Every structure is written in C-alpha cells, then in structure tokens.
A protein has these predicted regions:
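Glycine-rich flexible loops
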Residues: 20-261
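Bacterial N-terminal signal peptides
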Residues: 6-16
Length: 261
C-alpha cells in the first residue's frame, strides 16, 4: 500500500508539473528578448540594473524575463518563464529579479500590454522628483503626449520602503498608477515603459531617455519657455512612428547581437 501511495503521489506531481509547464516559446521571441536587453544597455537606458520582459507567445498569462543579472550580459540560456503571479516555472536554482512583480502585475492588469521595460534612466529620474512634467519635445517621443504619471511608493507602501517593487501589492499599485499611459515615472527610482510589442517598448524606453535629456536642455536654453508637441501633433507622429520604428530596431538589434558574439 505504501509503495502504491508513493507511486500515486509521484504521478500526481508529474502531472501537476506538466500542467504548469507551458509550450516552449518561439526561439525568435527569445532572441528578440535577448536583443532587447542588450539594446537597452547599448543605448544607455539600463546599466547593471533594470530589466525587460515580453508576454509568452503561446501562454499569454505567462511572461519571459531574464534571470537576475546585468541586462548587457543576457543570453538565450538566461531567459526564464514566469506565471501570472511572478513565480518562476522552472528556476533550476537561478536567482530571479526582486522586482519581477512590476511585470507580473502590469501584465495581469493590462492584457493589451505585450512588453514591459523597467529602468533607472538617469535623465528621466529628475522628472519624477520635481514638479516639471515629462512632455514630448520632438516627434520620436510623441508617445509622451498624454503625459507620464508619477508613481509615489509612499502611498502604497508607507514611508519606510527601500523603493523597490518587491511585492505583488506594490506591483499592483504601480499598474494602477500607470493606467493607460505608455510610461510611468517612479519617484526616486526610475520608470516603467510599456507597449503592445517588444520592439515598440524598446523604442519607447530609448526615446523616453532621449526626450528627458532634450527637455532638460530646452528648459535651460529657453529659460523655461519650450514649445512642446500639441495633442494632434503627438497623435499623428505616434501613428507614423509605429510604421517605421522597425528601422531603428533592426539597426539596434544587429549591433547588439554582433557585440554579443
């Protein structure tokens, strides 16, 4: 009887494990995620910290994210699968990012979002700690036309956090603050950028950083007087950019993967 129960328990565990395991993600998607990590490093959006994820193409409630490591060193072997709650499906002893809940909770709250970038973009951080709003100063940052809300972690986690989104509850609060915006600033921390594709998320993350630099320069040069894109200009430029951003992606990816060899 004991032997039978042991066999039965083993069978149940095997079935449960098989049920949790998703079909293998498209290798091309994994390659693009590796490229995204390296592009963001090459473009100065991330350094040793920061991360980017993409929805699983065959199991949409799951997502792909590298193990806890510097983005500029990520390879295909480092990509892991996570469930909707941020649990690693098959960790194999690998360390995971403390802030994976940024990704899990945004995907959970916003089914239309297919990719998430979290960074500590240096030029962006000042806009999260001052009253100056991040607004589009040129056509490639037109997606900022609707504004970028600022997430205040004290409102969700009190005044004694380490500023990290290390719990599902904090991740959910960030997802609510993001709303339908493509970018949310995180006071004293960085920002999160989202998009309906991995390529567009990378494009937006790069040009969020570029816009922040240009806006700061324009404000100084113009002594606070800057002509920003209006709503109509921003909407039209965003539509145009969606059709041509692959040009930047192809260039960035080729360079990023070439340096990886």
């Amino acid at each position: 009887m004991r032997k039978f129960l042991g066999m039965l328990l083993g069978l149940v565990m095997t079935v449960a494990s098989a049920a949790a395991q998703s079909p293998t993600a498209d290798p091309a998607l994994i390659e693009d995620l590796v490229a995204a990590n390296r592009i963001l490093y090459d473009q100065g959006v991330v350094d040793g910290f920061g991360h980017v994820s993409v929805r699983h193409d065959k199991t949409p409630e799951h997502f792909l994210l590298a193990r806890s490591m510097a983005p500029g060193l990520v390879t295909a072997a480092d990509i892991m699968e996570f469930d909707r709650d941020g649990n690693a499906i098959d960790p194999k002893g690998r360390a995971v990012y403390l802030e994976r809940f940024i990704h899990s909770e945004i995907y959970k709250a916003h089914p239309e979002i297919k990719a998430v970038v979290h960074s500590h973009s240096p030029a962006v951080i000042p806009f999260g700690v001052t009253s100056v709003k991040l607004r589009p100063v040129f056509h490639l940052s037109s997606f900022l036309g609707g504004g970028a809300p600022v997430f205040e972690i004290r409102e969700a986690g009190g005044s004694a956090t380490d500023m990290l989104i290390r719990t599902p509850e904090l991740g959910a609060a960030l997802a609510r603050s993001l709303g339908t915006a493509p970018v949310a600033l995180m006071r004293g921390h960085g920002d999160v950028v989202v998009a309906p594709s991995l390529q567009e998320a990378v494009f937006r993350a790069v040009y969020t950083e570029v816009n922040a630099r240009l806006e700061a320069e324009a404000l100084q040069l113009g002594q606070g007087q800057v002509v920003f894109l209006n709503d109509e200009e921003a909407a039209k430029a965003t539509a145009t950019n969606a059709g041509v951003l692959v040009r930047a992606w192809d260039l960035w990816k080729a360079r990023a993967l070439a340096t990886a060899r």
